[in-house]
């Protein structure tokens, strides 16, 4: 075993922690607006303390147009009024500390909102000092610079006729990618992170962080050539306190890459979310909507591979649910008569491995997937997929079956606090 791991002084508090992810919109509404809020989280801290958690991973609460449920940030240093005020956030941090519950913020450093002041300035002219905060290519407005596709569907380029250029976005057109080759842009992000560290935040979940080293000219998005250079600089500049925990979302990570991310010298990140086990029920070479039955020996081999691969030279994050995934009880268990037994079995597997467990709101209750009419879904990914597949002539019942099985809104329904109307989540309309 690595001497670095044997030296307990290099261990972080997070290596013996359990984190609980909260999706604020659907956790608890205290105002009757139908949307969860920060005060609702503060009200339930005693419940969370009784669960035995060490920290809360809080999905984005920054100011945002909410095109992608807060993952399109328009102000990194402001709370969206949808969730409350800065005073509400400060109260949550302070009350959490009283209960030894740390607050971990979900931060998007790969892209921002097209309503962020940086982008509003950037598209005014090519000479604007914020122009190079983003990725641009000249063009005629008819043919995009290349054939890259956005993750939510459609081209990865959108044209701005006022300046005769296309900007790059891996997700929605309202989420322009930030240009990490620009030192001024990087420093602006680091200042925003320090703002929250100074307020008492003790860690960050970094959304699609493996994308920041992208090179659209080479059609490279994940694990780009300068990725680890950027991560080391980010860690040194923004996460310099030893107690700050960082977990990076890295869909393309394998064990060897994860060793670089989570090496014990903490020069990059504390750990990463990798998704190899999550893809085992997806048909090879197809989209996430195209599923196949999970073969249990494959899951066992995958989990063992990561446990053995990072033992002594990195650190595993452990999860089966989050805001982007269907409920695991419905996915890999039996959400009918064996719902409770399935939930307990899956929890035993999760907490029996080496690593830091992350549980998602309602996971402790064995919450399940839902089936709604298409008009009641709100997730941009679901709506785009439905539109594209229906346009291709797919049968609606097949499209809806895929949404029921894999849609992200499965995880975003209200937390079930009681058996009363709206599950005790709100006195209004969810």
What are these regions (language model features)?
Residues 1-430:
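Active-site and adjacent substrate-binding regions of carbohydrate-active enzymes
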């Amino acid at each position: 075993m690595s001497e670095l791991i044997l030296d307990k002084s290099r261990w972080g508090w997070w290596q013996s922690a359990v984190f609980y992810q909260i999706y604020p919109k659907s956790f608890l509404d205290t105002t009757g607006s139908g949307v969860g809020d920060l005060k609702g989280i503060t009200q339930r801290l005693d419940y969370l303390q009784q669960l035995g958690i060490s920290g809360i991973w809080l999905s984005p609460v920054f100011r945002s147009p909410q095109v992608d449920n807060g993952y399109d940030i328009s102000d990194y240093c402001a709370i969206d009024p949808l969730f409350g005020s800065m005073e509400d956030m400060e109260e949550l941090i302070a009350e959490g500390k009283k209960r030894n519950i740390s607050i971990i913020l979900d931060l998007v450093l790969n892209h921002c909102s097209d309503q962020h002041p940086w982008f509003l300035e950037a598209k005014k002219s090519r000479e604007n000092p914020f122009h190079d905060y983003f990725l641009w290519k000249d063009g005629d407005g008819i043919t995009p610079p290349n054939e890259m596709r956005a993750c939510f569907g459609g081209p990865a380029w959108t044209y701005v006729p006022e300046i005769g250029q296309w900007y790059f976005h891996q997700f929605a057109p309202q989420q322009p990618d930030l240009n990490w080759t620009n030192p001024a842009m990087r420093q602006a992000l680091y200042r925003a992170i320090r703002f929250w560290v100074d307020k008492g935040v003790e860690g960050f979940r970094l959304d699609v962080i493996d994308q920041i080293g992208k090179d659209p000219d080479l059609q490279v998005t994940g694990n780009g050539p300068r990725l680890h250079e950027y991560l080391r600089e980010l860690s040194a500049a923004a996460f310099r306190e030893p107690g700050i925990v960082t977990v990076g979302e890295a869909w393309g990570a394998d064990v060897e890459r994860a060793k670089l991310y989570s090496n014990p010298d903490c020069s990059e990140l504390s750990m990463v979310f990798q998704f190899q086990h999550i893809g085992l029920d997806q048909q090879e070479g197809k989209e996430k909507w195209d599923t196949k039955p999970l073969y249990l020996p494959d899951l066992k081999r995958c989990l063992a591979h990561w446990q053995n691969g990072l033992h002594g030279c990195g650190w595993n994050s452990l999860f089966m649910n989050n805001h982007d995934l269907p409920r695991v009880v419905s996915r890999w268990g039996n959400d009918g008569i064996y719902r409770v037994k399935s939930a307990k079995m899956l929890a035993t597997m999760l907490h029996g491995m080496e690593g830091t467990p992350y549980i998602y709101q309602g996971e402790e209750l064995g919450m399940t997937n839902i089936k709604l009419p298409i008009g009641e879904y709100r997730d941009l990914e679901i709506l785009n997929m439905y539109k594209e597949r229906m346009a291709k002539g797919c049968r609606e019942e097949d499209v809806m079956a895929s949404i029921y099985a894999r849609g992200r809104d499965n995880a975003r329904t209200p937390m079930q606090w009681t058996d009363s109307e709206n599950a005790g989540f709100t006195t209004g309309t969810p």
